[in-house]
From Swiss-Prot:
A Pfam family per the record: RbsD_FucU
Domain of life: Bacteria
InterPro entries: D-ribose_pyranase, RbsD-like_sf, RbsD_FucU
A molecular function (GO) term: D-ribose pyranase activity
An annotated GO cellular component: cytosol
Active site: H20
Entry protein name: D-ribose pyranase
GO BP annotations listed: D-ribose catabolic process
Record keywords: Carbohydrate metabolism, Cytoplasm, Isomerase
Similarity-based family: Belongs to the RbsD / FucU family. RbsD subfamily.
Lineage: Bacteria, Thermotogati, Thermotogota, Thermotogae, Kosmotogales
Length: 132
């Protein structure tokens, strides 16, 4: 058994397979995930687990050089927006329309991690960096 860090087998595997600029999407319980996509569904009930808790765990495992957010989060969910920015304060941030966000996720995500989050626009695309 691992001593620390992510113990979910699928997420640990995805994290280990991430290369520079690879992307994963961490999403709320209502996000439309394309058929055939690799998905780790952590959702149990609405609100659990929370998106921010999953992001905190991933932040400990991965180097994130950029995040992509739907620009609607700024006005529709400022509390979540601020929490995400605080967590990834050293990463570049791109904002796109929610419809564009879904397209980017569909074509560029190695995997989706579905949370129980049930607040508006609580979806993040994480782009992996390198430690050298």
């Amino acid at each position: 058994m691992k001593r620390s860090g992510i113990i979910n087998r699928e997420i640990a595997r995805i994290a280990a397979e991430m290369g520079h600029m690879d992307r994963i999407t961490v999403c709320d319980c209502g996000f439309p995930i394309p058929d055939g996509a690799k998905v780790v569904d952590l959702s149990i009930i609405k609100g659990f687990p929370r998106l921010i808790d999953v992001l905190k765990a991933l932040r400990e495992e991965l180097i994130i050089e950029k995040i992509i957010l739907a620009k609607e989060i700024v006005d529709k969910n400022p509390e979540m927006h601020n929490a995400i920015l605080k967590l990834f304060s050293d990463a570049a941030v791109d904002y796109v329309e929610h419809s564009e966000f879904k397209k980017i996720a569909a074509v560029s995500s190695k995997a989706y991690i579905r949370t129980g989050e049930a607040t508006p626009y609580s979806n993040v695309i994480l782009s992996s960096g390198v430690d050298f």
